[in-house]
Amino acid sequence: MIFTIVTIAVLLMLFFFQRWYTSREIAREPYYPSNAATIYLYGEYHGKQEYLDKEFELWKLRYEQNGMRDLFIETEYYTAQMLNIWLREPDDEILNVIYNNNEGTLMHTEAQLDFYRKIKEECPETVFHGTDIGHIRETGEWYLDYLEENGMKNSREYELTKENILQGDKFYANGELDNAYRENCMVENFIREYDTLNGTAIMGIYGDGHADPSDESVDDNTHHMAFQLREHYGDIIQYESIVTLTK
């Protein structure tokens, strides 16, 4: 009798845990700006096959029908630069460096590799823009070595990579995650990249917690990335949740 009660209790706990875990992937409402959009953001939960498939479908559509070439992603500046080099290379050596260094993260999945490979095959003129802090120091150091070997130690790329690595060091300093600092860095990095494009329309893929310009919630007294970008650029950001689009 006691065993039966315990079994039922455990099953109920598992059921409600599953409901809670699934519910974290909220199907948020889209946001359409009052002005003509030039920044199209999609919010995701990282590493899931169905979400990455939808993201590729959306990017290919904008690439082919709208002529977009600039894809902003929630990764490091230097990782995006390496992806841009890899798009022109005949092999996957650089992609494998990125993938192997991402071991233990949500980006270390076959689905993520497939996403990049499909872009290389079907959208080869894509230009990646990475606007996150330097999470994976090893990848940044690889790119610094690459730049040095190619006579680019005094380049802007080298300077930005060093800055990006230091952003990551500060975020992880003393074993504490400074989320407000990261969010502000993501905003600064996004603005730096976007302002070089002179108003060209872009698509961006970010974690859902960063991507909604109508989300007024704060983390450590700091608004999330898209809300800050809306305040900076005005109402030109369109947002849709990949969770909603795959329902």
Language model features with spans:
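Compositional signal for N-terminal targeting/processing segments
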Residues: 3-247
